[in-house]
């Protein structure tokens, strides 16, 4: 049975970990980094780049380099947050047929789960390379305050990436698992303050020893799914744009290339200002006008940055207060405050956390890795590799249905421990009503219109009766992933209608299947491309070897033999220009055979080690010779793309 990996699918960066010998291990990617930028780029020649390689080319390909896509996952196009993002990102956010926010790249419409799936595939490959075996199962984390549509969309992304998502768990809960696993200090209450690249969560969690078992119980959670490091970067970008406009009268917001360079610099400046008091943003040739090229040089102090983002930091205070109140505890009851997410490295954020909780936050948890580590531990729990751990998570928002007068009637209150089930009996609003529409909602507002619509379905064929007579039992069932299943049953007839909530938006089963097939086809393309590169490199090595040997020993051959080799060389060089693996392999083999005579001559004259462009000479056992040069594919070779 393969291992269940833990993936922190972040807005800005992602991370993967696995349980090994009873300990969680964060896995380094192919570039040697422990986190991978959650960036996906679509190149002109149809290649899809993920991670650092996508980030490196963002400046030259801004419209087709997608970052912070997690902020769009499970969201409608007309949501205020999405509209705000449209103004800030260089790529094109469009309205899909189902009213979701999708993205257009190189003339193709792409759903956010499809983009996130590319990041998950990179994480999957990272784990497979390390473990040396296929990985098919994962625990994926989401912000605690993600609603049902966003959780469902994240699960879809996992399926598209070829992963069976064994569990969706909340990021702060995962961080608490990472923090509390090795702590043997008895019962304690902790606050997890998670300010990441795109989302903010606060969870109050109780870690208790119950009959020798580590029990992690989430008491309350709150947050803001559109507040994070990306917003901090945006404030710096706005400031730089304003300063440049004051000085030069040019608005850089209209220049996609300049905007991408500003984004890079804003992120770097923000990071620098966590450890130094001031930094300078220098961007030569940022744009040009009739008078010539323009350069941007702006000094930013830590105090200036703090004034730019003060209101963003303040926005984290209210969710913290609500979570403490909902948990039914006092601030003084909290034993530890843990910081998660890269943005918590900012001194001003740490200061605010200290002010809210009246204690220094702990610094012994890695804010970038804790969530993936917790996901890996949960994977170990599900696999039975980690014993004596019980995780009790909650649903972040209340769930209910729309009733007469456009009111939301709640069936499950926020911060209810999951999995959970609740039912309530409703009736008809009109005489002889034969069908009812069950409109499922999520949120805290009294009126239905103020809450998130998760979907609706009908219960038909109700026998005609006076209003208020039929008894319709509505049941809400939340599974351990926090995903909702709803059913409605006419108690008189026993007729039942049920749905697994697939938001009125969201991807249909057919769309998910199509995307899974696309991803598989792409993986097959990558495999074929890799085989072609290998064939080209082997052919190039053979050509190089034969040419070298011909130069040194060609005079020992008869003219006929020489022209045979030269002809095979020419054919191999021509084959290299093609993109046909079979042709390249055939011509490589033909060249090896044609140069056979040359190899024989070299060996017979005691020149064996230098002469081997092709196969072993006849009569040799081959057991003790050095490797034949033409058969060695040097690791330094790169794909040879001869221009026609």
Curated annotation (Swiss-Prot):
Cysteine pairs bridged by disulfides in the record: none
SUPFAM superfamilies hit by this protein: Actin-like ATPase domain, Heat shock protein 70kD (HSP70), C-terminal subdomain, Heat shock protein 70kD (HSP70), peptide-binding domain
Region (Disordered): 589-644
Pfam families: HSP70 (PF00012)
Database matches in CDD domains: ASKHA_NBD_HSP70_DnaK-like
UniProt keyword terms in alphabetical order: ATP-binding, Chaperone, Nucleotide-binding, Phosphoprotein, Stress response
Modified residues annotated as Phosphothreonine in this record: 199
InterPro entries noted in UniProt: ATPase_NBD, Chaperone_DnaK, Heat_shock_70_CS, HSP70_C_sf, HSP70_peptide-bd_sf, Hsp_70_fam
Origin: domain of life: Bacteria
Keyword Kinase belongs to the record: no
UniProt entry tagged with the keyword ATP-binding: yes
Induction: By stress conditions e.g. heat shock.
GO MF, one example: ATP-dependent protein folding chaperone
Compositionally biased tracts (Low complexity): 604-619
Function: Acts as a chaperone.
Family: Belongs to the heat shock protein 70 family.
Protein's recorded name: Chaperone protein DnaK
